[in-house]
């Protein structure tokens, strides 16, 4: 996307394409972080400004500070801190170039006012969230995914879970927590068709979490038994096919796992419990 995935967008989405058991909140490289967060268009503009500052005729000490900061940015996300931005701004080329006076026309003032009010609006929502007033922050700024996720974990009824999960998925459909919540709500009302759809979406975004597969099996096993008791063999067979397919899904995940995933401390472990294997053997 030309304007990136947004703040924490990569962290929220990486479960859908990861090839090992890991969790990455920051990539520890400011250039890559900018590309992920704000996209390639703003990043290119930033690179042009920095390169211009490096080649410009300005004090050597300013260039040394700038190059040192840039070198460290390749190993950490320094620009997450406002103070680092201030240092970067001081080191940019402010001494050369043409001076141009811009008159503030009515349209320009209107745009400035909208930007200021928008920043204040988002800032109020963020301040409420970081001060622990999650519900109030969502009322002010309902597009805060993290706040929505906190409210989801606090939901007490299936209706509340569904409502918060839908709001989260409207913002980012790669969040497994929301799909799990919808599956749990569907399980509570006995809608196993929805359970299958929602758990498959959850598994697509949490490929290396064994508990997800076990939870799916447990829900399907209950569905299978209930359908058999009701004489609905067609629906029971759908549940059974999904149960048997769990191991096939695991095999596909392991086949696509990167070789490096087996060399780190947290290695993939997706061995289903004996209860699963016994169930499959008994119903072949």
Predicted segments with their positions:
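Internal/C-terminal transmembrane anchor helices
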Residues: 104-129
């Amino acid at each position: 996307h030309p304007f990136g995935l947004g703040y924490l967008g990569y962290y929220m989405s990486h479960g859908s394409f990861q090839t090992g058991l890991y969790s990455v909140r920051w990539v520890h490289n400011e250039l890559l972080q900018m590309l992920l967060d704000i996209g390639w268009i703003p990043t290119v503009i930033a690179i042009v400004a920095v390169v211009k500052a490096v080649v410009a005729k300005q004090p050597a000490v300013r260039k040394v500070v700038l190059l040192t900061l840039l070198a460290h940015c390749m190993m950490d996300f320094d620009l997450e801190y406002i103070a680092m931005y201030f240092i970067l701004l001081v080191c940019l080329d402010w001494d050369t170039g043409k001076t141009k006076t811009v008159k503030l026309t009515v349209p320009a003032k209107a745009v400035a006012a909208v930007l200021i009010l928008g920043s204040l609006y988002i800032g109020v929502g963020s301040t409420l969230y970081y001060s622990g007033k999650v519900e109030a922050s969502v009322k002010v700024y309902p597009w805060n995914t993290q706040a929505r996720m906190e409210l989801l974990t606090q939901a007490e009824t299936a209706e509340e879970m569904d409502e918060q999960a839908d709001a989260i998925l409207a913002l980012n459909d790669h969040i497994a927590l929301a799909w799990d919540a919808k599956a749990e709500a569907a399980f509570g009302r006995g809608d196993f068709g929805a359970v299958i759809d929602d758990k498959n979406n959850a598994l697509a975004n949490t490929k290396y979490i064994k508990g997800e597969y076990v939870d799916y099996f447990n829900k399907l096993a209950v569905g299978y038994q209930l359908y058999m008791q009701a004489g609905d063999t067609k629906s029971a067979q759908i549940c059974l096919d999904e149960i048997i397919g769990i191991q096939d899904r695991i095999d596909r995940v392991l086949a696509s796992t990167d070789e490096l995933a087996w060399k780190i401390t947290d290695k993939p472990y997706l061995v289903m419990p004996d209860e699963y294997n016994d169930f499959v053997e008994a119903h072949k």
